[in-house]
UniProtKB/Swiss-Prot annotation:
Gene: mdh
Protein name per the record: Malate dehydrogenase
InterPro entries: L-lactate/malate_DH, L-lactate_DH_AS, Lactate/malate_DH_C, Lactate/malate_DH_N, Lactate_DH/Glyco_Ohase_4_C, NAD(P)-bd_dom_sf
Entry annotation: catalytic residues: H178 (proton acceptor)
Binding site for NADP(+): G7, A8, S9, G10, K11, I12, G13, N99, I121, S122, N123
Amino acids binding substrate: R86, R92, N123, R154
Length: 314
């Protein structure tokens, strides 16, 4: 598999490069950044080969450094991590407008060179996924974002801790915006196949407290260590592996939907359960939700859709 990383000189891009280099199915990695960061990419390339050698790994993988997007022409997946990082005083609107311009520039050039899958990491991820979709002209299954995947993992950890069970026994997901309007699907949350509402400890489950913590989790990491890279990079590698091996896994990613869920109108990219395989997003999964969950999702959808309309002309 051939993978390109746009923004490879950044925190997520650097960690992602190492994790991908350790994957046996990855045969070529294109490290892409602005021309001012080329020397950093060259140093990263040298460091990656050292890391592989130190781990006793074959170093037959090709690692290329470039500021030219033409190297994405043969990529199976192009991962976009580039963009402005949100600072404490920056508004969501400022971040949205700034990154929309960056994403537009990259995606239009990528589309000129070939047919790839675009995996969006840059925030606000739902909006940047939508911007990448409309600017690329690609099919909607080819463009997707990290969405609420990490939020779902964080909620999964909280459920496992509360019910004192192994993480693998928990099935849950958060849908909607990767942001304050996200919606945990409690009705589809189970431990060992048993809905958590049927478990004795559910009465003490601090749902609201956990949800508020998850909503602010990313910002808390930014405040403590100026950003997260290990969690997102690890999640990205797992999703790339799903595509490489055609695993058909059900994950919660940001993808374009219009009428797949009852009660929504118009289209935008938002976090929903999807089947992930060799073609990217192979199916949007229609899960049944309780009335309050459906209403929460509709509100989240309308919020994201409104922002999507704002960035169409940027």
């Amino acid at each position: 598999m051939d993978v390109s990383i746009i923004g490879a000189s950044g925190k997520i891009g650097s960690v992602l490069s190492l994790l991908l280099a350790k994957e046996s199915h990855i045969k070529n990695i294109n490290l892409i950044a602005r021309s001012s960061s080329i020397n950093k990419l060259k140093g990263l390339k040298m460091d990656l080969y050292d890391a592989m050698a130190a781990a006793g790994q074959d170093t037959d993988i090709d690692i290329c450094c470039d500021d030219d997007l033409s190297c994405t022409a043969n990529s199976d997946i192009t991962i976009i991590t580039a963009g402005m990082a949100r600072t404490g005083e920056m508004s969501r609107i400022d971040l949205m407008k700034g990154n929309a311009k960056i994403v537009k520039n990259y995606v239009k050039n990528i589309a000129n060179f070939g047919d790839t899958k675009i995996f969006m990491i840059s925030n606000p991820v739902d909006l940047m996924t939508y911007k990448a979709l409309i600017e690329s002209g690609y099919e909607k299954n080819q463009v997707f974002g990290l969405g609420t995947h990490l939020d779902s993992m964080r909620f999964k950890v909280a459920v496992a801790k509360h019910f004192e069970v192994h993480l693998d026994d928990v099935r849950t997901r958060i849908v909607g915006e990767h942001g304050d309007s996200m919606v945990p699907v409690i009705s589809a949350t189970a431990v060992g196949g048993i809905p958590i509402k049927r478990l004795p400890k559910y009465e003490d489950f601090p749902y609201e407290k956990i949800l508020e913590r998850i909503k602010g989790y990313g910002q808390e990491i930014i405040n403590l260590k100026n950003g997260s890279e290990y969690g997102p990079a690890s999640a990205i590698v797992n999703i790339v592996r799903c595509i490489a091996h055609d695993e058909k896994r059900l994950l919660t990613l940001s993808t374009y939907i219009e009428d797949e869920i009852e009660g929504i109108e118009g289209g935008c990219c938002i976090g929903v359960p999807v089947k992930v395989g060799k073609n990217g997003i192979e199916e949007v999964i229609h899960i049944k939700m309780e009335d309050d969950e459906i209403e929460g999702f509709k509100k989240s959808f309308e919020l994201v859709k409104g922002y999507c309309r704002q960035i169409e002309s940027i």
